[in-house]
UniProtKB/Swiss-Prot annotation:
Any Gene Ontology biological process: positive regulation of cell-substrate adhesion
Lineage: Eukaryota, Metazoa, Chordata, Craniata, Vertebrata
Name this polypeptide is given: EGF-like repeat and discoidin I-like domain-containing protein 3
EGF-like domain location: 24-60, 74-117, 119-155
Binding site for Ca(2+): N119, I120, E122, D136, L137
Origin species: Homo sapiens
Motif mapping: Cell attachment site: 96-98
Location of the protein in the cell: Secreted
Disulphide bonds in the chain: C26-C37, C31-C48, C50-C59, C78-C89, C83-C105, C107-C116, C123-C134, C128-C143, C145-C154, C158-C314, C301-C305, C319-C476
Sites carrying sugar chains: T73, T88, N140
Top-level taxonomic group: Eukaryota
Length: 480
């Protein structure tokens, strides 16, 4: 009796304990989905002890729980979904090494691995441009951009002049705490003279001598992204005057103000100013200011607090940088026109379309059409479809005669043949943009909604003297 018990015990042990040896039937493991291989008594035979939810000799099928009346059915390897992080399981005759797995995981953006279990570090490919700092997130990343850049990848520049120097910002938008009066009140250094590079005997703003807390303020008329400021001094009665240091404040309503702080502290930032009366000095704001009003508070001045200045930045949405008319990035051959005027019918005084560049200098420094009618146009080929969000126009003088475009329409095209005139969405008719009122002041119009096109045409609608134009387009080339 004892001998028979021992025999049965040995048999039970041989059946219940997996034997793993070199060349064993269980090496490699033929059981899938974590099944345990149990060698059989006969050579080459085995059985699989399957985990819960799997069945078949190799544990390759998933048990689907059915209703009481139905028999359990096999749902395949994709139920339940073995893929993590929203991965999609697809049936496939795929192998992992020597093992047939029966499925593959299609991973969403930002994940990889057999089961989409790994978060990809997107910062490894350095997606942030122009000095942006990348932070890896779950299935994503973010870029901390320098003040003068913006966009998902810091790809958009945001440091164009906002219009103090060019005149887009009007006299009424520039105010100050006080005005200096000299020569028995005959000389008045008003705040609206505080325009960068302004010429003349009185060419800057100066605060009154008894003003203990002077400031100068710019009303941008809408909330904008301000990324920097350029300051400049001036000479008064032959004496250099300038601001050596200053603080900046900003507001959205002109009543409640916040001082610009040193990043990460509650300390007011003191910006370095000028060292002479004429050299411009620029400071950038990182992070940028988003506000309608900007104030500059002089802290230390040489003699009197005297200032010429320009604000830098862009619209809140970004994508409002000069596209290259003034800089020359847009080349001469890209600018064409309906007709050309020659003063005194002389070739040396030909007002060609390539000269229609904002702030162009010289005797012949703009485009003038050969005819004064509403069929004239100036065209710019941007070479690729471009997002155009604004336009700046300017007139010129022909031998002392003031000439400018008082109003205009815009048209756009992608092939240069089929044109669409920009519409006023509210009135559902062609939009007529307000142009210039003199030969030199910049006039900016925002194009909202923007134009997406390769070719842009300016269609003069009214004019003074002759149709004469200098211009700049604003926008950006769309990037993913």
């Amino acid at each position: 009796m004892k001998r028979s018990v021992a025999v049965w015990l040995l048999v039970g042990l041989s059946l219940g304990v997996p034997q793993f040896g070199k060349g064993d039937i269980c090496d490699p493991n033929p059981c899938e989905n974590g099944g345990i291989c149990l060698p059989g008594l006969a050579d080459g035979s085995f059985s699989c002890e399957c985990p819960d939810g799997f069945t078949d000799p190799n544990c390759s099928s998933v048990v689907e729980v059915a209703s009481d009346e139905e028999e359990p059915t096999s749902a395949g390897p994709c139920t339940p979904n073995p893929c993590h992080n929203g991965g999609t399981c697809e049936i496939s005759e795929a192998y992992r090494g020597d093992t047939f797995i029966g499925y593959v995981c299609k991973c969403p953006r930002g994940f990889n691995g057999i089961h989409c279990q790994h978060n990809i570090n997107e910062c490894e490919v350095e997606p942030c441009k122009n000095g942006g700092i990348c932070t890896d997130l779950v299935a994503n990343y973010s870029c901390e951009c320098p003040g003068e850049f913006m966009g998902r990848n810091c790809q958009y520049k945001c440091s164009g002049p906002l219009g103090i120097e060019g005149g887009i910002i009007s006299n009424q938008q520039i105010t100050a705490s006080s005005t200096h009066r000299a020569l028995f009140g005959l000389q008045k250094w008003y705040p609206y003279y505080a325009r960068l590079n302004k010429k003349g005997l009185i060419n800057a703003w100066t605060a009154a001598e008894n003003d203990r807390w002077p400031w100068i303020q710019i009303n941008l008329q809408r909330k904008m992204r301000v990324t920097g400021v350029i300051t400049q001094g001036a000479k008064r009665i032959g004496s250099p005057e300038y601001i050596k240091s200053y603080k900046i404040a900003y507001s959205n309503d002109g009543k409640t103000w916040a001082m610009y702080k040193v990043k990460g502290t509650n300390e007011d930032m003191v910006f370095r100013g000028n060292i002479d009366n004429n050299t411009p000095y620029a400071n950038s704001f990182t992070p940028p200011i988003k506000a309608q009003y900007v104030r500059l508070y002089p802290q230390v001045c040489r003699r009197h607090c005297t200032l010429r200045m320009e604000l830098l930045g862009c619209e809140l949405s970004g994508c409002s940088e000069p596209l290259g008319m003034k800089s020359g990035h847009i080349q001469d051959y890209q600018i064409t026109a309906s007709s050309i005027f020659r003063t005194l019918n002389m070739d040396m005084f030909t007002w060609e379309p390539r000269k229609a560049r904002l702030d162009k200098q010289g005797k012949v420094n703009a485009w003038t059409s050969g005819h004064n009618d509403q069929s004239q146009w100036l065209q710019v080929d941007l070479l690729v479809p471009t997002k155009v969000t604004g336009i700046i126009t300017q007139g010129a003088k022909d031998f002392g005669h003031v000439q400018f475009v008082g109003s205009y329409k815009l048209a756009y095209s992608n092939d240069g043949e089929h044109w669409t005139v920009y519409q006023d969405e509210k009135q559902r008719k062609d939009k007529v943009f307000q142009g210039n009122f003199d030969n030199d002041t910049h006039r900016k119009n925002v194009i909202d909604p923007p134009i997406y096109a390769r070719h842009i045409r300016i269609l003069p609608w009214s004019w003074y003297g002759r149709i004469t134009l200098r211009s700049e387009l604003l926008g950006c080339t769309e990037e993913e």
